[in-house]
C-alpha cells in the first residue's frame, strides 16, 4: 500500500503584517531593549466573552509559537493559538486613531470596540 504525504506547508499559524512589525520595532526601540518580543494572547472578558491582549516579554516559553517578521518576534501560547489560528495581526492608522487590529477568521461575533470577540455566538456588545 502506498500513501502520499503532502509536505507543502499549511496555512501559517498567524499572519504578522509588515505594518504591525514596523510599529512593534518602533516601540521596542523606544523601550531600549532589543530582546523584547510581542506576545499576543486571548483571555476571558470583554463584552463579547473573550478579549485580545498584547504584552512585551523577553522570554520565550517552550510551548510558544513564534512568528517572525522583519526581525520582530511575535509570541503566542498554545491556548491562545487555538483561538487565533489563521488570524492576521495588523497595525492601522486612520481617522479613528492608530491601533493594532486582529482579523480573526475564528470569531463568530465581535464587538464594535474591536478588542472583544466570541467563538460561539456569545454575548452581544454592551455600552462601554
From Swiss-Prot:
InterPro entries linked: FeS_biogenesis, FeS_cluster_insertion, FeS_cluster_insertion_CS, FeS_cluster_insertion_RrpA, HesB-like_dom_sf
PROSITE patterns, sorted: HESB (PS01152)
GO biological process terms, semicolon-separated: iron-sulfur cluster assembly
A Pfam match: Fe-S_biosyn
Keywords: Iron, Iron-sulfur, Metal-binding
Binding site for iron-sulfur cluster: 47, 111, 113
One of the record's GO molecular function terms: iron ion binding
Cofactor(s) required, per the database record: iron-sulfur cluster
Top-rank taxon: Bacteria
Cofactor mode of binding and number, as noted: Binds 1 iron-sulfur cluster per subunit.
Family to which this protein belongs: Belongs to the HesB/IscA family.
Oligomer and partners: Homodimer.
Entries under PANTHER family matching the protein: IRON-SULFUR CLUSTER ASSEMBLY 2 HOMOLOG, MITOCHONDRIAL
Protein role: Required for insertion of 4Fe-4S clusters for at least IspG.
Name of this protein: Iron-sulfur cluster insertion protein ErpA 1
Annotated source species: Methylococcus capsulatus (strain ATCC 33009 / NCIMB 11132 / Bath)
Lineage summary: Bacteria, Pseudomonadati, Pseudomonadota, Gammaproteobacteria, Methylococcales
Amino acid at each position: 500500500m502506498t500513501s502520499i504525504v503532502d509536505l507543502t506547508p499549511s496555512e501559517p499559524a498567524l499572519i504578522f503584517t509588515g505594518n504591525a512589525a514596523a510599529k512593534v520595532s518602533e516601540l521596542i526601540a523606544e523601550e531600549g531593549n532589543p530582546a523584547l518580543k510581542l506576545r499576543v494572547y486571548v483571555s476571558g472578558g470583554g463584552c463579547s466573552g473573550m478579549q485580545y491582549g498584547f504584552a512585551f516579554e523577553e522570554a520565550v516559553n517552550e510551548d510558544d509559537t513564534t512568528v517572525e517578521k522583519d526581525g520582530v518576534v511575535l509570541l503566542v501560547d498554545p491556548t491562545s493559538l487555538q483561538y487565533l489560528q489563521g488570524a492576521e495581526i495588523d497595525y492601522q492608522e486612520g481617522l479613528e486613531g492608530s491601533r493594532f487590529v486582529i482579523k480573526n477568521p475564528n470569531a463568530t461575533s465581535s464587538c464594535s470596540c474591536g478588542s472583544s470577540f466570541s467563538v460561539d455566538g456569545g454575548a452581544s456588545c454592551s455600552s462601554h
